[in-house]
Amino acid sequence: MKSRVYIVLTISLLFVSCTSAPSATPTLVADVIPLTPAGATVPDNTPTAIATLTNTATPTNTSTPTFLPTNTPLPPLTVSFYRLRIEYSTTSDWTTLDLDKATNILTARLITISGNPSNFEVGAYHLALNQPISAAQAGQSVGVTVDYALSPNSLNQPLAFLLKKGALNGSVVRVLNVTGNNVQLIQEVKHQVVVESNPDINPLAFSVDLSSLKSTSPLQVQIERPTSQRMLWAFYYPWYYADDWSSTQLKDRPITRYSSDDRRAITHQIEQAQSAGIDGFISSWCGPGDYTDQNLKLLLDLAQEKRFSVTIYFETLKDSGRPRDKDEILKWLSYAISTYRGHPAFMKVNGKPLIVIWASESVPLATWKSILEELRAQGLDATYLATGYNITNLDVFDGLHEYNVSTIPNLTETFRSVARATRYYGLLADSPTPKIWVATVQPGFGEFPDRDNGKFYRNTFEAALKSDPDWIFITTWNEWWEHTHIEPSELYGDLYLRITREFAEKWKGK
């Protein structure tokens, strides 16, 4: 049985383990797109023909793949921008800096950290710093330097800031223009006083005139798209035994009961998925020799027959909800890459196998960097997608995805903001390496929110398409315990396959 543990890290992470049982509804918070671990606090393709899906509870069966991803290359992006640098430091115990969201910020990148902040947060429109009160009393300084890529139209009005801090000492904001090796100070603001009308947060609003940047031409960079084709994927769970379906904890069941090691059942699932425009399964994987590993081998062989793609969802967490240690992660990834990279059905991006990482933020980014460097040194390179919308992860990983988006407020705007920050991340790197933006869609989660006869699923698809994603992930094909499945079922028939096909045609037909 499968259990999940929910904790909040920057934006809440849905922690998965490799045993099986239903779980509580998670809480996600996505008001800010974080770039570093959060914690700073304040006091208070044109598709081919596809098989017809019926409107009954009987799932469609087709013997050949009928919906393949477009092979039309996506065009590169040519981007003009100005590079703005913010040096932000404090000798107080806490401070936050918010930028006006009306400013068209394309992306942001952490450059340096100074001192020893106990927590810090770096986002496209929000910075924050914390240090112990004892350090502040001793006058110690902590800070971050962050670069921003601004659209040229951002220069038409002053850039507005709101600076807050604790009662101790002060904070300093330096705004600079970066052109090649030339760094020029535009404005410096020091906030040292206690605001008597609001001494708890001591707010200071100020603005910076950027019109002087118009005297120089914006930088211009061409960014290639990270993938050559749009692909629609579904998270897939190969852990079911025949007797699982008798559990009273299930809210719904497949029309035909199955075991995850049944060849006929897997083939039927692939055919159903293809008829709905799905190009591949992201198969939950719990390590060498596990039941999910045994079934992965079978899934790959059957997928090859159907020209269907497969990759793994690397389960970073143990059954306890705690992350695996570095040595185990290294061992598992080494096995997965060396064992499966040669399989024709295993997805590859520019020749490198694709690995999707679950709960990546449960392991420090520095640890991931070390793991991936060791694997590359062994000749075991891959394309890795991190979990969550922590943009700083793109210094190590090749793209971002989220598993559960069911409770993210303002999903359309969140997708657009994260897509922009991900797609343009290379603007601020030494070389403009393209990063993969994945939008997630899902029909619901457990009892919340209400599926509303497919309306919720449609709404997440609409939000995803507006962000122009490289790929779309569906949560899920068959996670029955959490009631996120779109696989044909007793309650819904093939409704969700028909909705999936509708949006797949709309998206790939662009």
Q: Predicted regions span which residues?
A:
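Intrinsically disordered, low-complexity Ser/Thr/Pro-rich tracts
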Residues: 1-83, 103-114, 169, 178-183, ...
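Glycan-recognition and processing domains
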Residues: 74-141, 188-219
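A short beta-strand element within beta-rich, extracytoplasmic domains
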Residues: 80-90, 108, 142-146, 155-171
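Extracellular or exported targeting regions of proteins
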Residues: 115-123, 129-132, 149-170
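Short, surface-exposed tryptophan/glycine-enriched loops
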Residues: 143-154, 202-215, 341-342, 348
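Beta-strand signatures of extracellular beta-sandwich domains
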Residues: 174-176
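Residue-level signal for glycine
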Residues: 182-183, 187, 479
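Glycan-processing catalytic domains of CAZymes
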Residues: 214-510
